[in-house]
């Protein structure tokens, strides 16, 4: 029988995708408690901003209180009036209003996300690292790596 591993996409920033291995998440909520801006909502698994390329929250904000900084979508709290239009526009439900908009800022001032650092099971990881490890394991196992190219016409 094959073990099914499911991953939940947490954030996209153009360079990195942060994912949660739902099968490894033990629900300890360390990611939620460690977030300095309370940007993670935890139901059965953590829910964070996807930092999507289209930024519907950014365009919905009438006060220009949401900006893209270092490929992360960030709320500028001094500009936010808490109208909630960004939360309505977010397709992932990752923004909540508590006087002002609160969402994951992707730890844009850090090299590594805090939630990833504190996860005791390693359930939070960068997709690039996961894929690189899988590729390396395949190369090590078969000692060869084959590529299939499509004929583009």
UniProtKB/Swiss-Prot annotation:
The keyword Transmembrane does not apply. [4Fe-4S] cluster 4 binds at residues 61, 80, 83, 86. Keywords: 4Fe-4S, Electron transport, Iron, Iron-sulfur, Metal-binding, Repeat, Transport. Binds 4 [4Fe-4S] clusters. The keyword Transport applies. It comes from the Archaea. Its cofactor is [4Fe-4S] cluster. GO terms for molecular function: 4 iron, 4 sulfur cluster binding; metal ion binding; oxidoreductase activity. Residues 16-45, 40-71, 71-100, 95-129 form the 4Fe-4S ferredoxin-type domain. [4Fe-4S] cluster 3 binds at residues 49, 52, 57, 90. This is Uncharacterized protein MJ0264. It comes from Methanocaldococcus jannaschii (strain ATCC 43067 / DSM 2661 / JAL-1 / JCM 10045 / NBRC 100440) (Methanococcus jannaschii). The lineage of its organism: Archaea, Methanobacteriati, Methanobacteriota, Methanomada group, Methanococci.
